[in-house]
Curated annotation (Swiss-Prot):
InterPro entries: Pepsin-I3, Pepsin-I3_sf, Protease_Inhibitor_I33. Residues 1-17 form the signal peptide. Aspartyl protease inhibitor. Disulfide bonds join C135-C230. This is Pepsin inhibitor Dit33. Residues 204-219 have a biased composition (Polar residues). It is found in: Secreted. The keyword Secreted applies. Keywords: Aspartic protease inhibitor, Disulfide bond, Protease inhibitor, Secreted, Signal.
Length: 234
């Protein structure tokens, strides 16, 4: 049961990370609604690409910004490596009973280092892709496959902004609904550490009152209507 619960939590964590922390792909195609991955920004010889599409050459100031980002990224990678090593050693000691529950709980809740801020030339507007039936929109430009078609009109840009806001709200609603269903089944055990310590200490701990799970339900959020930038024939 605990193994199953662990997988459920990992799935929810991945979904939350996608919905809240990433500017990725927005899908509104035939029988599709969700979020996928993205290559983001890539710079080669000071040429800027977004999701493999060439945008422009970097300015001198942007090149300096890129150099600082590379330096910060290298430092971030070292901090993450150190943090993971601390956790690995902590869990190894826990397996041999050399650390108590409070110390391990503190270790599990310790925050990971924050990644460096993206350069200003790699914004959500540059990298977000909107997939519709038959075409894709990126940076307010319509593509069919990899072929550029045209820029969006002012009215179409407003339609896209409205769609993005509604799709984001819909995806957050889905994530919240899944979390509520898991909580109703297993209770609020969002800390993975508890999965492996509850059984060890349950014989010495005093019985506690059952956790009351909130039965409040959100008003359903419907998926937004898809903008008609292109027409696919099936």
């Amino acid at each position: 049961m605990k193994i199953l619960f662990c997988f459920v939590l990992l799935a929810i964590a991945a979904l939350r990370a996608s919905v809240i922390n990433r500017h990725n792909k927005r899908f509104a195609g035939f029988s599709v609604a969700g979020i996928g991955g993205t290559a983001g920004c890539v710079v080669v010889d000071n040429k800027l690409f977004a999701n493999s599409f060439y945008l422009r050459d970097l300015t001198t100031e942007e090149q300096r910004e890129l150099a600082q980002y590379v330096e910060d990224s290298n430092q971030y990678k070292e901090e993450v490596k150190t943090s993971l090593e601390e956790r690995r050693k902590g869990w190894q000691l826990a397996r041999h009973g050399e650390k108590d529950a409070k110390v391990l709980s503190s270790l599990a809740e310790k925050k990971f280092p924050k990644p460096p801020k993206k350069p200003s030339f790699c914004s959500a507007g540059d990298t977000t892709q909107y997939y519709f039936d038959g075409c894709m929109v990126q940076n307010n430009k319509i593509y069919v496959g990899r072929m550029y078609v045209r820029d969006l009109t002012s009215d179409e840009i407003n339609q896209l902004k409205t769609f993005d806001a509604k799709m984001t709200a819909y995806q957050k609603y889905l994530s919240s609904s899944i979390q509520q269903q898991v909580d109703s089944l297993f209770g609020d055990k969002s800390n993975l550490f508890n999965l492996f310590t509850d059984t060890r200490h349950e014989t010495s701990s005093q019985p506690s009152d059952a956790t009351t799970i909130s039965t409040t339900t959100q008003a359903p959020v419907e998926p937004p209507e898809t903008p008609h930038f292109c027409i696919a024939i099936y």
